Design a protein with these regions (language model features):
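Structural recognition of the beta-strand scaffold that forms the well-ordered cores
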Residues: 1-2, 27-33, 68-71, 92-95, ...
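Substrate-binding cleft of extracellular glycoside hydrolase catalytic domains
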Residues: 1-63
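Solvent-exposed loop/turn segments at secondary-structure junctions
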Residues: 3-8, 34-39, 74-78, 99-102, ...
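Short amphipathic alpha-helical surface micro-motifs
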Residues: 11-14, 74-78, 89-94
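Conserved N-terminal glycine/acidic-rich loop preference
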Residues: 47-48, 52-53, 78-92
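Aromatic-lined carbohydrate-recognition surfaces of secreted/lumenal glycan-active proteins
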Residues: 64-79
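Functionally critical loop-and-helix segments that line ligand-binding/catalytic clefts
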Residues: 84-147
């Protein structure tokens, strides 16, 4: 899981891979993009953001042997993804959207609540669901996890 910043994407990818201990069967690496409009503008705008995201996604994918996932908010999907290059739209997305299900992207996971409760864990936890059946999830685990 990598929280994307405005630093050069290749150095972020190098850092992520150096610090990660990816093991066989792990879920694919995740690129969490939660930059403010101001920070996106400061880095050169949405086209620069998209280019940098692709650098990270391709490099981490190449070196990890699996296709990373993009984690974004529904607001990001609405405001930025319509302008994303087709190459970026091919990546699966984990959307944080609380309330109504309305992704408009190739949704893989949906974070539907930031304040769920789970027995054995103190405090709030995110509640997430896979967008598919149990059979589809098992197939995903067999084919898309780290090798």
């Amino acid at each position: 899981y990598h929280f994307f910043s405005t630093r050069p994407a290749m150095s972020q990818a190098d850092y992520f891979l150096k610090k990660s201990r990816l093991r066989k069967g792990d879920l694919p690496p995740m690129l969490d993009v939660e930059l403010s409009d101001r920070r996106i503008a400061a880095m050169g705008g949405r086209d620069v953001l998209f280019r940098e995201m692709l650098v990270w996604l391709k490099e981490v994918g190449r070196r990890s042997g699996t296709t990373p996932i993009i984690y974004v908010s529904q607001d990001f999907v609405n405001r930025y993804m319509p302008f994303a290059p087709e190459e970026l739209k091919k990546y699966s997305v984990w959307v944080a959207r609380y309330g109504e299900y309305k992704p408009y992207v190739h949704l893989l996971y949906w974070q539907l609540s930031p304040d769920g409760r789970v027995r054995g864990i103190r405090g709030d936890v995110d509640i997430d669901v896979f967008n598919g059946s149990e059979e589809q999830f098992n197939r995903y685990l067999r084919t898309q996890t780290v090798k």
